[in-house]
Amino acid sequence: MTLPFRAMEDLGLDALRSRWTHPVGVAVIDSGIDCEHPELRGRVAESARVTPQEGGAFQVVRHPEPLSQDLFTQGGHGTAIAGLVLRVAPRARIHDIRVVNPGGILVDARALAAALKFAALHEDIRVINLSIAADASWSNEHGIRRWVDEAYRRGKVVVASLSNRKRQGPPVDFPDVIGVHGADLGAYGIRYGPCLTAEFQSWGDRIPAPSAGGGESLRGGNSFAAAVTSGLAALLLGASPDLTPFQVKSLLKEGALGQHEDR
C-alpha cells in the first residue's frame, strides 16, 4: 500500500535553518575528508584516525587540527559524505573519523567499535553517520552493539546506510539506528517504510557532491542517501536541541515523502 506523498519541504528546511540555535556536531566515520576543499575549509572541527595497536586492539588518535588529504581521502568518499551533510545543514560541524582503509574497505570489527566508542563519548557530537559496509558476522563482536546503544542512550542520532552487499552487516539493522537506502526521490526527498531492513529511503541518485581535490561530481547509492538523512537530523537538532533520537526519527517519519509497506 502506498499512502499519499508529502513534500519534504513540509519539514520547512529553510525555516529550520533560520531557527538553528545550537551547535550540532556530525561524526563522519569514513575514509577521511579533504579538509582543504573550498566547501569544507573551516567547517571540520577535528580529525581522528583509528589506528591498530599491539595485540590486535585499535585506538583513536585525535588531531585538534583537521588532517590534510592523504591516501585514505583520495577516493573522495568521506569528502562527498561530509559535503552532503553540510549542504543540508550548513551550520553543522563535521568530526572527521578515519576508519576505512585506502581501498575503501572496513577491515576489522574492532576498528569500527573504536570509532563508535569515540563518537558515543564525544560531548560535541550529536549525529553519527556510517556510510560504510560492515561484515554481516560482526553484529555482536567487539562492542559494536554496545557503543551504538551507548550513543543512543547519550542522545546521539546514529544514521547508517544499507550495504551494497546481499548480506547486511551492523549497525543498519539495529533498532536504535536510522537505516537508510538510496532511491530516486529528487532533492532531499525521504520515504519511510517500517517493514524494510533500512526503514528510510532518501535521495540517492545523481547527487552533486564535493570531490577530493576540489570541485564536485555526481554520486549515487546508499552511502550518500545516509548523508542526506544525517543532514536532516542535524537540522532538526540545531533547531530543537532537546530532541531525543526517538523524536528525531519520528519527525523524519512525519516529514517523509510518503510511507509504504514492503511487499
PLM segments and residue spans:
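Active-site core segment of subtilase-fold serine proteases
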Residues: 2-88, 92
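Extracellular S/T/G-rich loop segment that most often corresponds to the catalytic His/Ser-adjacent loop
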Residues: 161, 169-238, 242
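Mature extracellular/periplasmic domains of secretome proteins
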Residues: 15-21, 106-129, 140-154, 166-181, ...
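Structural detector of well-ordered beta-strand residues that form the stable sheet scaffold
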Residues: 95, 157-159
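Active-site/binding-pocket entry motifs
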Residues: 34, 50, 100, 186, ...
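C-terminal subdomain of the subtilisin-like protease fold in secreted/lumenal serine endopeptidases
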Residues: 1-5, 10-12, 126-130, 238-263
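Structured catalytic cores of enzymes that bind and process phosphorylated ligands/cofactors
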Residues: 28, 80-82, 88, 97-102, ...
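Subtilisin-like peptidase catalytic core
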Residues: 63-135, 252-256
